From Swiss-Prot:
It comes from the Bacteria. It comes from Bacillus subtilis (strain 168). This is Spore coat protein X. Keywords: Sporulation. GO terms for biological process: sporulation resulting in formation of a cellular spore.
Length: 172
């Protein structure tokens, strides 16, 4: 295979990509905008008093995954009790919703209150993964108890709650 010299080097910041010129020429000929809103400043972009509303519930995500594997080999009289507590997520989400409601009612300026509430809800994303693997081999008369309590989710949302209270006190 024969190598050929390149006129463009990716690591050289002064070297223009060969397709840049072709794409710029293509855009000049194809792009014609007759939009009164974006080009002439007669719409949302030209209005300094415009308020962009966002969907408040779009980023309120809670995800918990538990994967537990218990392998018992060549054993007898084994008692296994496994508890997985994930109900705390819905309680914590309700707590976060209460904080957002308190934020909306405590800030006098409606626009600022909505922006703070949107920011709080956009930061409410919790993810927790718990994997356990337990191997019991050549054993007799063993009692095993596993408890999976997703406390990290509670701590994460408690931090969001403290930040929300701090923001409310700074704004007021």
């Amino acid at each position: 295979m024969e190598s050929r010299p390149y006129s463009w080097v990716a690591l050289d910041p002064d070297c223009d990509h060969p397709l840049d010129d072709k794409e710029k020429d293509k855009e000049k000929h194809e792009r014609k905008c007759h939009c009164d809103v974006c080009c002439n400043g007669n719409g949302f972009f030209g209005n300094d008093n415009a308020f962009i509303d966002q969907d408040l519930a779009q980023a309120n995500l809670n995800k918990q995954v538990s994967d537990e594997t218990i392998i018992i080999r060549d054993s007898c009289d084994i008692n296994v009790t496994s508890t997985d507590v994930q109900a705390v997520t819905s309680v914590v989400t309700a707590l976060n919703a209460a904080v957002v409601t308190a934020t909306l009612t405590s800030i006098a300026d409606g626009v600022i209150a909505e922006l703070v509430a949107q920011d709080l809800l956009q930061l409410t994303a919790n993810k927790q993964v718990n994997r356990q693997k337990l191997l019991i081999e050549c054993s007799r008369g063993v009692n095993v108890t596993t408890v999976d309590a997703d406390i990290a989710t509670l701590i994460s949302t408690a931090t969001n709650t403290l930040v929300a209270i701090l923001v409310i006190t700074l704004v007021l």
